[in-house]
Regions:
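Feature captures the catalytic cores and cofactor-binding loops of soluble hydro-lyases/lyases
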Residues: 1-117, 131-173
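C-terminal binding/interaction regions
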Residues: 121
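Channel- or pocket-lining gating/hinge segments that regulate access to a cavity or pore
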Residues: 126-129
Length: 173
């Protein structure tokens, strides 16, 4: 996946509120966006994303969801949608009456990574990274170079039958 970040921050509440900024972000963000939701550390105890939010994201042609919290309805998401969801946890619990959306499209922090709105979110089966807009072209060129070199290195390893030969020629494994 590759797309610009749309950020959402949620915090603890006793109010019975829907995640309004998150719903607005899904409906109003440009197609190709990656919805990034984070917030209070206890967000991992509830599902901030599920089947209906996935349906909205698919309808609006978003790229993926990255959640520093929980997801639910995984069987439905996998069965009915070709939509990547990267989540910290899987849990059936709802956010209603526990969390509310505090902000949208403001810088957020996940672990030690700050994600700014518009930063490129890049992911695959191995995980997700955030590429700041200011260095996106440089990072893309470097990634393409590494990918090309590793393809050549893999060919050499297979042809020679030796990891050592691949390391000697390319300097890394």
């Amino acid at each position: 996946i590759v797309g610009p970040a749309v950020t959402i921050y949620e915090d603890v509440t006793d109010e019975k509120l829907p995640p309004q900024h998150a719903l607005d972000a899904i409906d109003e963000s440009a197609s190709g966006s990656v919805i990034v939701i984070t917030g209070n550390p206890s967000l991992e105890t509830v599902a901030v994303w599920g089947g209906l939010m996935t349906a909205g994201a698919v309808a609006n042609k978003h790229e993926a969801a990255v959640l520093n919290g929980g997801v639910r309805d995984l069987a439905e998401i996998r069965r009915d949608y070709d939509f990547p969801v990267y989540a910290k946890t899987v849990t059936p619990g709802t956010t209603l009456g526990r969390f509310k959306t505090i902000s949208a499209n403001q810088p957020v922090t996940i672990g030690d990574v700050t994600v700014n709105p518009g930063d490129l979110i890049v992911g695959d089966i191995d995980g997700v990274v955030c590429v700041p807009q200011a260095v996106a072209a440089e990072v893309l060129a470097l990634a393409q170079s590494i990918d090309s070199r590793e393809l050549e290195q893999a060919k050499l390893i297979i042809q020679s039958g030796s990891l050592r030969e691949g390391l000697a020629k390319y300097g890394r494994i």
